Amino acid sequence: MRIADYSVTKAVLERHGFTFKKSFGQNFLTDTNILQKIVDTAEIDDQVNVIEIGPGIGALTEFLAERAAEVMAFEIDHRLVPILADTLRDFDNVTVVNEDILKVDLAQHIQNFKNPDLPIKVVANLPYYITTPILMHLIESGIPFSEFVVMMQKEVADRISAQPNTKAYGSLSIAVQYYMTAKVAFIVPRTVFVPAPNVDSAILKMVRRPVPAVAVEDENFFFKVSKASFTHRRKTLWNNLTGYFGKTEEVKDKLTKALDQAGLSPSVRGEALSLEEFASLADALKGQGL
């Protein structure tokens, strides 16, 4: 029997008198086939260390610990720590850290792996309410995670992996794809969770690029420009950029020159621009002193 078997999950929760906290976005997976598929998608073996976020009662952790060198699981809910000590008692390669992943010194924790030089993968069922902040925090942490295989709301997975000229494409797509390739591996129906969420989930596989997707003069400025370009999706690039940089004649003149230099029409919408075009635009705007 597995932790994720419905009868086991139910028994564990009852034994510990656990009640779900909506504020933590807790939904426990009760399908062992899907858990196996997640670990297979992540290609976990004994030459990999794993960071897990939100282990719950250890359903995914169990599958990870069977194959990984070590698993470090960050759980914000202190009530789950004794439950994890119970459900994962047979594993000596799991460390549970009762801290908020957004506030920990992750680089310091990683040094606590027995072999910190092994590749590190992030495998997790992320809380829906805070998926994007967690992902961006980890991606921008400077820690060279080789891969992320994470479950999230399907809509968010679609946005992250979206291509130009699609409804889902936006600044989040650019922010992630600048650092990583992103592809939806498979869909997870809402019916396999306790309690069931209101939406379906997706497993997103992201692999770190050896170097960023595009070369830019100023990364922060590149992200600001891409974000500004999607402020109002139905508006043109010109309208969004004048809304961000200002509408003085001087700004308009600089914008005109930058768009011309980047080979872009003022009437194009942000959703039509590739990462390469956003890079050209950001560098041209920077060159104009904006």
UniProtKB/Swiss-Prot annotation:
One GO MF term attached to the UniProt entry: 16S rRNA (adenine(1518)-N(6)/adenine(1519)-N(6))-dimethyltransferase activity
Root EC class: transferase
Domain of life: Bacteria
InterPro entries per the UniProt record, alphabetical: KsgA/Erm, rRNA_Ade_diMease-like_C, rRNA_Ade_Mease_Trfase_CS, rRNA_Ade_methylase_Trfase_N, rRNA_adenine_dimethylase, SAM-dependent_MTases_sf
EC number: 2.1.1.182
Localization: Cytoplasm
PROSITE patterns: RRNA_A_DIMETH, SAM_RNA_A_N6_MT
Gene Ontology cellular-component terms listed: cytosol
Membrane-crossing residue ranges in chain numbering: none
Keyword line: Cytoplasm, Methyltransferase, RNA-binding, rRNA processing, S-adenosyl-L-methionine, Transferase
Keyword RNA-binding: yes
Binding site for S-adenosyl-L-methionine: N27, L29, G54, E75, D100, N125
Reaction equations catalysed: adenosine(1518)/adenosine(1519) in 16S rRNA + 4 S-adenosyl-L-methionine = N(6)-dimethyladenosine(1518)/N(6)-dimethyladenosine(1519) in 16S rRNA + 4 S-adenosyl-L-homocysteine + 4 H(+)
HAMAP family: 16SrRNA_methyltr_A
NCBIfam families linked: ksgA (TIGR00755)
Family: Belongs to the class I-like SAM-binding methyltransferase superfamily. rRNA adenine N(6)-methyltransferase family. RsmA subfamily.
Record's function text: Specifically dimethylates two adjacent adenosines (A1518 and A1519) in the loop of a conserved hairpin near the 3'-end of 16S rRNA in the 30S particle. May play a critical role in biogenesis of 30S subunits.
The name this protein goes by in its record: Ribosomal RNA small subunit methyltransferase A
Source organism: Streptococcus pneumoniae (strain P1031)
Gene that this sequence comes from: rsmA
